[in-house]
Structures are given as C-alpha cells and as structure tokens.
Amino acid sequence: MRIKEISLRQDPDLRKELALLARGCDFVLPSRFKKRLKAFQQVQVQTKKEETLPPSLSQTIPTFYFPRGCPKEKVNIDAVIAKIERTFSQFPNERATLDDMGKVAKACDCPLYWKGPLFYCAGGERTGYVSVHKFVAMWRKILQTCYDDAAKFVHLLMNPGCNYLVQEDFIPFLQDVVNSHPGLSFLKEASEFHSRYITTVIQRIFYTVNRSWSGKITLTELRKSNFLQNVALLEEEADINQLTEYFSYEHFYVIYCKFWELDTDHDLYIDRKDLARHNDHAISSRMIERIFSGAVTRGRKAQKDGKISYADFVWFLISEEDKKTPTSIEYWFRCMDLDGDGALSMYELEYFYEEQCQKLDNMAIEPLPFEDCLCQMLDLVKPQYEGKITLHDLKRCKLTNVFFDTFFNIEKYLDHEQKDQFSILRDSEGESPEVSDWERYAAEEYDILVAEEAASFHFVLGSTEVQLPKSWICNLSFSLHEKISKISTNLNWFRLWIFCLEKK
C-alpha cells in the first residue's frame, strides 16, 4: 500500500514530541512511528529514483542480432509450400523416396545435394519414404525459424536440441554424395572405401571450417566459410576432382596412399615409428613426440595407446604440405609451444633446432649456429614483442613455411637454403596464388602414383602388350595389393579383362 507524500510534522503526536525536544527534553520516538517513518523514507527514495531514470530507448533501437539469419519480408511461405505439394503430387501416394528428393530439393529452392539431409530430417530413413504432410510440416517450421542457407543446413543435419554440427552429422549427407554423384560412380563396387573417403572429406571440412578447434561447427563458422558454395558446385561440376577444397577424390587417394605406406598392419592407426618414416624421416623426432602428445589430436583412446588415427593423419599431412594456411599455422604453433603459454620462447626454438643441427652433422653439413639462425628467423617474422613469437606474429608473416621447416623438417629446410632468397621473397610479396601449396603437392603426388601404377599394370596377351589407360587407373585408385586381392570380385576388373581381349 502506497503512503501519501505528506509531512510527518502534521502528525499531532509527533508535533508534541518535537515541542518537548525544543524545550530540552529527550526525544523518544514511539514505536508506532518507526514503521511509518520507514515507509515514508522508502516512498521518498522510490520517487527520487523514478525521477532520475532516463526515458526508455528500447522502442527506438531496431533488432540487430539474428542468430538464424535476417528474416526476409518478401518470402511467401504459402507459395513455397504449394510448389512443394505440386512436386509431391507427381509421386505415387504423394510419397517421395531418396531418389525423388532431387526434385523436392529444387522445389525448396535448395542445391541438389541437399536432398539427402532433407530426406533424413523428415524421417525418411526409418520408413524409406517421406510423405507430403510430414515434409511440409518440417519445411514450414524451418522457413519460419531459419532465414539463411547456413541456418537451414545446420538445422537439417544437427541432432535435436543442438545448434552446431559434429563430425557424425555429416555422414548421411556425404554417403548420399558418394552414392549419387557421377564423379564417384566407380566407387559403387568398392563400398569398403566409402567410409575412408567420407572420413577424409569430414576431416577436410573441419580442418577448414571449424576455426575454433572445438570439434563443433557453429552457424557463424559455417557462414564465414565457403563450404555451402562448394556443396552447390557438386551439382554443376561432374568431375569431382575439380572441387579441390573438400571433395576431390584425387586428394583422398594421395592422402590414403601416404597413410597406407606407413600403416604396416593396416589397422588404420599408426604409432611414432610409423609416422617417423614419412618422407624418409624428414620430420624430427621431437616434433613427432609433440604430435603424439595430444596437442593437435583428439581422442583419449588413441593417445593412451600411443597411436594416431587416419583422421589425425589427414590433418598432419595437409598441415605438413601447406604451412601457410591459418589452420596449419595453428597446428604447428601448438606443437612448438611446449609450455602452452601462447608464445614461442627462444628456449623452445632452441629445443627443436638442436635436433636439426644433429641431423646436419650426420650429413656432414656444418649447421648454422643457433644465434645466427635465431636472428634470421626474427628478421623473417618481425615479432611484435621482444623475446617471443606469438601466433599473431606468424599469421602476419608470409613465409611461415620457411620458419617452421627450419625447426623440424630437414629436407625442406635444405631446399629453402638452396633456393634463391630473392625468389622466395618475390613469391611471398606477390598476390595469393590461385593454386595452394597443398593443391600443388596433391597434383604432383597423384601423377607420380598414377605413373607408378600404370607401369606396374602391363598385361601381355599372347604377343600383344596392353597398357592400362590413365582413366582406368584413376577410377581404380586403390592400393596395389588390395587391387590384386579383388581381381575376381571387382566388376571393374572384369570390364578391364574384356577391354584387354578386345585389344588383342
């Protein structure tokens, strides 16, 4: 109950007490006045606060944060739904199978290869089909809550209750790409390679898109990446190898063959000794130890057993062959930052350079003293703070490959030393190349692998020697001994045998 704002002096009892106080008597405030005085003071304070508050501005500030995309006023949801219903009317009982979802995706104004996520999000995996009513209910909800492609794609793939994507969320989507893309048609008879190709693509997606290293792709990360643009290109580009950032089969082949050479027991795990054999022991043992320390790998089981998985190897190989990308710089920085303080000290640089000096001594090459090497690297990086190199310093540097190779890759270090320094500087100061270091490496290695296999597969039928066309080798790009073990069962090999007979 609000107390009226009146002076307490008007109270007759209080006036009597005040008169006694004026004559020199002690002032005794009756207990009944204490509550009234307290209520009076509270009203006065509340009135003062209300007077000092500025007028509310909430009505004048428009909404500026749209986590699911900015709403589009001109979108007519009913028209979109009507278009979808007309598409479903073409199917028996107005039910769409996975093969029909390409038309449905187009009716939704989505790229063709969203068809798998659309099908699975509407519950098609359980029944083998999607009814028009269930799909319309699902898509209407998405249109009402998701206002851009990134928000829609995440909603289609994510688990209920999540607002991010983990690696497992991409498997159904990529399996549909493997099953239906014309550039991967030769994989239909080699189902055992589906999971390995999918694993490779997933790791490349997270390598490029998941900039936070959290293992969870957020809406913001997806919007900042070019992944959805590459998904749209799947429809336009029949040659999967032209999509070099994520989906290239040739890149998968190079990565898998490099791993297969190291994985002697073929359990899809390698230990320290296996990884040390990469590129003829070019990587220092101290760096190998750091890779297995868990600084750049995930999974407690692998770390406990002292092994890394094929998925971890994908990150390693891409980082090793292209040390200029943000993720690769972060990868090697984590490895070299021994104490995890966010900076590379001179002691940490010396720790890795010591082994490089030992290798150079074994090769009868006089190593550069560490002090001189350090001066060169500081001139190269130009750190902001004296005595330490931060991640920001390395990302500003255009020759991070030279910096990292100096401390843990002896072969590439010697290559840099033999190069003309002016040409190195000229390359670093030029515009960003159209072909990255990784793409250049993958193309060269693929040509080498194809040439080696082409030389190995010469068939002699009578007096006629038949050499496999390159296209056959491309389509049958599996490991050599795996091919031999599948000659009797692989349909492609049967076709090849017919081809050889025709040549004869």
Question: Model segments located where?
Answer:
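Acidic, Asp/Glu-rich intrinsically disordered regulatory regions of eukaryotic Ca2+-responsive proteins
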Residues: 1-504
